[in-house]
């Protein structure tokens, strides 16, 4: 997992509530078991015209000024719907490192933490300020300080200390377990052999 400490990036405002996993990555694109290749189909039904499959120039991800943004600012209940880890893979593959929402589906939130996508919760008033920032401007997400900053604004957020440790150190669940390899081996030697 890639380390995340401080992200300095523009934001993509997509201030809609109840964006579900099928809107994030539609079911017809779930045939792959790899974690890559999903970014091109992120928000597919909004990014492309239904009749011609051409890019919809009005959708924010298709606007050139937002192409390099790594932070998505969105509404309440993000990632609701079916349990679909592919939704997180699509966001990561597109280039997002951080999603700032009012709330998340529990399963989506856990999938995010396990796949290196930092999911931050902020109240609507704070997200409204962030969503209004011009495309060329950048904000700072400072994980060690648990802050989102832009000019005179500073928004504090909470995160589970273990997840914070995992993000800052680039550790996934397997890497955390491997930190205890010697203790696990010692314990296994103490267990009676029933053969």
Swiss-Prot record:
Write out the pathway annotation from the protein's UniProt entry.
Answer: Amino-acid biosynthesis; L-leucine biosynthesis; L-leucine from 3-methyl-2-oxobutanoate: step 2/4
Keywords, comma-separated and alphabetical: Amino-acid biosynthesis, Branched-chain amino acid biosynthesis, Leucine biosynthesis, Lyase
Q: Which GO terms describe its biological process?
A: L-leucine biosynthetic process
Question: Which region is the signal sequence?
Answer: none
Q: Out of the domains of life, which is the source?
A: Bacteria
- Which GO cellular component does the record give, naming just one? 3-isopropylmalate dehydratase complex
Transcription among keywords: no
Please give the PANTHER family that the UniProt record associates with this protein. 3-ISOPROPYLMALATE DEHYDRATASE SMALL SUBUNIT, 3-ISOPROPYLMALATE DEHYDRATASE SMALL SUBUNIT 2-RELATED-RELATED
NCBIfam families tied to this protein: leuD, PRK01641.1
Give the record's subunit note: Heterodimer of LeuC and LeuD.
Instruction: Please report the name of this protein according to its UniProt entry.
Output: 3-isopropylmalate dehydratase small subunit
Q: From which source organism is this entry?
A: Oenococcus oeni (strain ATCC BAA-331 / PSU-1)
């Amino acid at each position: 997992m890639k380390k995340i400490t401080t992200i300095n990036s523009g934001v993509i405002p997509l201030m809609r509530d109840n964006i579900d996993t099928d809107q994030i990555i539609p079911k017809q694109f779930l045939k792959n078991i790899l974690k890559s290749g999903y970014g091109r189909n992120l928000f597919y039904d909004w990014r492309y015209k239904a009749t011609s499959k051409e890019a919809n120039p009005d959708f924010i991800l298709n606007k050139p000024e937002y192409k390099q943004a790594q932070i998505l600012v969105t509404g309440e209940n993000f990632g609701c719907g079916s349990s679909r880890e592919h939704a997180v893979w699509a966001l990561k593959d597109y280039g997002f490192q951080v999603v700032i929402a009012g709330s998340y589906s529990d399963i989506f939130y856990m999938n995010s933490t396990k796949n290196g996508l930092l999911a931050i919760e902020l109240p609507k008033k704070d997200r409204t300020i962030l969503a209004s920032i011009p495309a060329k401007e950048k904000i700072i997400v400072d994980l060690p300080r648990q802050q989102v900053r832009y000019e005179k604004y500073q928004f504090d957020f909470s995160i589970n200390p273990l997840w914070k440790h995992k993000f800052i150190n680039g550790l996934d669940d397997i890497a955390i377990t491997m930190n205890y390899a010697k203790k696990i081996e010692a314990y296994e030697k103490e267990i009676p052999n029933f053969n």
